[in-house]
Swiss-Prot record:
It is found in: Cell inner membrane. It holds the Pfam family Syd. This is Protein Syd. HAMAP family: Syd. Interacts with the SecY protein in vivo. May bind preferentially to an uncomplexed state of SecY, thus functioning either as a chelating agent for excess SecY in the cell or as a regulatory factor that negatively controls the translocase function. Its main location: membrane. GO terms for cellular component: cytoplasmic side of plasma membrane. Gene3D superfamilies: Syd protein (3.40.1580.20). It is a peripheral membrane protein. Keywords: Cell inner membrane, Cell membrane, Membrane. Belongs to the Syd family.
Amino acid sequence: MDDLTAQALKDFTARYCDAWHEEHKSWPLSEELYGVPSPCIISTTEDAVYWQPQPFTGEQNVNAVERAFDIVIQSTIHTFYTTQFAGDMHAQFGDIKLTLLQTWSEDDFRRVQENLIGHLVTQKRLKLPPTLFIATLEEELEVISVCNLSGEVCKETLGTRKRTHLASNLAEFLNQLKPLL
């Protein structure tokens, strides 16, 4: 496990939860995750769940992705998706507004790995360098990804070679995120 990435993710999650508590006097609330089982759920309303992060309980790797492509995945990606269970968190990096993706449960973790495999299949078909997404943007064709060759974080337009460098590594990126409620 990459300790710098794990700590940066935990620190951002704490900043996010603290900001939520400061503004709403509660743990984060999600309508999107209502009805989806998770160890993160504290309580449920008629149409939403209050959640708090919980330690990840499965195998701490994305080996299913590695096996599917017979490649080695950046250790930071293993760490990012297996440090904790949490709800997705809205954030800002410079002037970029994003939704930081998280795994909500062990079932969700399997789904995330399947989506990462699908992403890599498309990149391989288009002969693009491999990246692994960590966040979504309002523009559906853009994501924040980690380059599997260099470990750098970039803003990527899906299906193209268009990439904008954002940070040298995932810990640096996470440390610069600001919670957005």
